[in-house]
Amino acid sequence: MILIIGGAFQGKLAYALKAYNLTENDVCDLAVSDPEPGYKCYRHLEALSRRNNDITRLLPLFEDAVVIARQVNGGIVPMDGAERAWRERYGIILQQLAKKSEHVTRVFCGIAEELK
């Protein structure tokens, strides 16, 4: 697994397409659909985690894929308890993915930084 993280609109998808020789047809957009097997790349993991409180059962689907996830750990901590709880769950999921990933890359301003 390859994990690419970064803030919104920082160039994560463009980096993934170029670095891993992917096309738009290789990408499953989790913001608009549930994950399906056979894709080389899954993007918007945060959207899937908002719809589904327990996505850990889906993690094996991502084992041989590039996973693109929005980084949400910066900024102001939300006052809403449900939003804070989601951020905690999502952070734990990202930790699990990072642990299982061969490579972890953070993209900021279109620049890739290898973390693992």
Feature locations, PLM:
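Glycine-rich P-loop/Walker A and Walker A-like loops and their local beta1-loop-alpha1 context
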Residues: 1-31
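Conserved nucleotide-sensing/catalytic segment adjacent to the nucleotide-binding pocket
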Residues: 25-69
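Sequence-level detector for tyrosine residue identity
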Residues: 15, 20, 39-42, 90
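Active-site donor-binding loop signature of nucleotide-sugar glycosyltransferases
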Residues: 6, 44, 109
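Glycine-rich nucleotide phosphate-binding loop and flanking beta-alpha elements
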Residues: 10-11, 48-49, 112
